[in-house]
């Protein structure tokens, strides 16, 4: 309200149109906010589950910690930390593009089954499980952050519409309407006075 308001019929029509557009757009924003809130809750659960899975895989891998330092098997273990294939796509959720992890393939180290202890398979499997689960957990966290950021942005816009734009526009309309109504009454009064003077002059 600090800026100058043009108290004209054109301004009234423009503000009326603006208010109608705000009123039409607000439900769409509120719907998007509700959808994002649901998606964020789902993403929170997925991120928590992925993190828990990764932590469990880490604990299983740490059970073999003493074996990691055996020089004979170090190369095989290190190869399990290398990613051969990482297939990612983009998924649109409530208008937000988030990363979709489709497939993770790690390097399969070559070693002689006859010349290695039976526990090596379990060791390498635990390493692979940890690496893959960590990648999925990081992807889930990235999705969550993107959805939370969009929810924050949409929430700000909803608040802007509800608490500033719509009330301010409504107040402006009311002010213009009162001014135009008062001016109309004044104009009518002036016209009556003018007619009366003309009539008196004729007499």
From Swiss-Prot:
By its UniProt entry, which Gene3D superfamilies does this protein fall under?
1.10.287.3240
Domain of life (superkingdom): Bacteria
The record's InterPro entries line, in alphabetical order, gives:
V_ATPase_D
Keyword terms of this UniProt record: ATP synthesis, Hydrogen ion transport, Ion transport, Transport
A molecular-function term among this protein's GO annotations: proton-transporting ATPase activity, rotational mechanism
Listed GO biological process terms: proton motive force-driven plasma membrane ATP synthesis
NCBIfam families with a match to the protein in the record:
PRK02195.1, V_ATPase_subD
Q: What does this protein do?
A: Produces ATP from ADP in the presence of a proton gradient across the membrane.
Q: Which family does it belong to?
A: Belongs to the V-ATPase D subunit family.
- UniProt-recorded name of the protein: V-type ATP synthase subunit D
Q: Which organism is it from?
A: Chlamydia trachomatis serovar L2 (strain ATCC VR-902B / DSM 19102 / 434/Bu)
Source taxonomy: Bacteria, Pseudomonadati, Chlamydiota, Chlamydiia, Chlamydiales
- UniProt lists the gene as atpD
């Amino acid at each position: 309200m600090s800026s100058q308001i043009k108290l004209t019929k054109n301004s009234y029509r423009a503000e009326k149109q603006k208010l109608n557009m705000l009123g039409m757009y607000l439900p769409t924003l509120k719907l998007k906010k509700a959808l994002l809130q649901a998606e964020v809750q789902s993403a929170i659960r997925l991120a928590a589950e992925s993190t828990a899975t990764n932590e469990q895989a880490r604990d299983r891998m740490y059970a073999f910690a003493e074996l990691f330092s055996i020089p004979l098997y170090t190369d095989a273990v290190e190869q399990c930390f290398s990613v051969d294939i990482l297939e990612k796509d983009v998924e649109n959720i409530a208008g937000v593009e988030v990363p979709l992890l489709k497939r993770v393939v790690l390097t399969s180290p070559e070693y002689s089954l006859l010349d290695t202890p039976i526990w090596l398979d379990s060791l390498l499997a635990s390493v692979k499980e940890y690496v893959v689960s960590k990648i999925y957990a990081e992807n889930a966290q990235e999705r969550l952050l993107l959805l939370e950021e969009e929810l924050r942005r949409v929430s700000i816009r909803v608040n802007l519409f509800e608490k500033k734009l719509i009330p301010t526009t409504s107040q402006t309309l009311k002010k213009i309407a009162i001014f135009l109504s008062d001016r109309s009454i004044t104009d009518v009064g002036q016209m009556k006075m003018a007619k009366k003077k003309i009539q008196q002059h004729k007499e």
